[in-house]
């Protein structure tokens, strides 16, 4: 694709493995920051749509702390979140026309890196604490929303792209009717993700985490 041109470039590249970012920060920088520069400077486009993550927020414990315009303390970010934040800043600096979408937890056809997948496969154990709270969104809904926002002619904005609610990992058992086992280390750390969706909710009807999980679960049958 380098050296070519297009009307809209949707960039969903970069490292998606948080543990690898912490183990190999240089690798993560090249994968999530340097790589985006290659595309921005070597492809001619009219609009750049960047797929980012809610991990750019230094505090996700309340919806007031995950508003798109909140001041982010980069010193509190882990390596993964900091590099994703740097990538966003690069887009904002070099792209005259952009959209940035910060995604929550992903489920969708073909995806295997999530707790629901681990729930239904007996050879796997869930690595997240049952008390961890996550906002799940289906990849199908993500694509539909991005194209809808683009069609509205909205430019140079950041959106949290997430479902309207957060659930606990322990709730998944009741949602899909499947019990699971947890790894020993799963209980050591409890995460709490409360994502503000007020801004994007003005333009779309938000789905729920339960709907996202059920659709994904049915696709795996």
Language-model features, listed with the residues they occupy:
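Conserved catalytic-site region of short-chain dehydrogenase/reductase
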Residues: 50-65, 79, 106-110
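NAD(P)H-binding glycine-rich loop region in Rossmannoid oxidoreductase-like domains
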Residues: 1-45, 54-59
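Active-site segment of SDR-like NAD(P)-dependent oxidoreductases
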Residues: 16, 54-58, 69-70, 104-107, ...
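NAD(P)-dependent short-chain dehydrogenase/reductase
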Residues: 89-135, 139-141, 148
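Mid/C-terminal beta-alpha module of Rossmann-like enzyme folds, strongest
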Residues: 145-195
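Catalytic helix-loop patch of NAD(P)-dependent Rossmann-fold dehydrogenases
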Residues: 27-35, 61-101
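Non-catalytic, hydrophobic alpha-helical segments
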Residues: 9, 142-146, 161, 172, ...
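C-terminal amphipathic/interface module of NAD(P)-dependent oxidoreductases
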Residues: 179-221
């Amino acid at each position: 694709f380098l050296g070519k041109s297009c009307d809209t470039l949707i960039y969903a590249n970069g490292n998606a493995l948080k543990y690898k970012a912490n183990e190999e920060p240089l690798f993560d920088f090249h994968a999530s920051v340097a790589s985006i520069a290659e595309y921005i400077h070597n492809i001619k486009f009219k609009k750049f749509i960047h797929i980012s993550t809610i991990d750019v927020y230094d505090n996700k414990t309340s919806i007031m702390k995950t508003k798109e315009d909140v001041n982010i303390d980069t010193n509190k970010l882990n390596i993964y979140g900091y590099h994703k934040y740097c990538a966003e800043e690069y887009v904002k600096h070099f792209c005259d026309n952009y959209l940035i979408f910060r995604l929550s937890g992903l489920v969708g056809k073909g995806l295997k890196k999530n707790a629901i997948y681990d729930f239904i496969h007996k050879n796997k154990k869930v690595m997240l604490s049952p008390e961890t709270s996550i906002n799940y969104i289906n990849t199908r809904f993500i694509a539909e929303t991005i194209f809808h926002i683009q069609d509205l002619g909205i430019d140079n904005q950041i959106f949290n792209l997430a479902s309207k609610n957060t659930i606990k990992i322990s709730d998944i058992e009741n949602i899909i009717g499947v019990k699971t086992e947890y790894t020993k280390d799963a209980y050591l750390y409890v995460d709490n993700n409360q994502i503000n969706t007020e801004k994007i909710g003005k333009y779309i009807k938000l789905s729920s985490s339960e709907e996202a999980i059920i659709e994904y679960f049915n696709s795996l049958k």
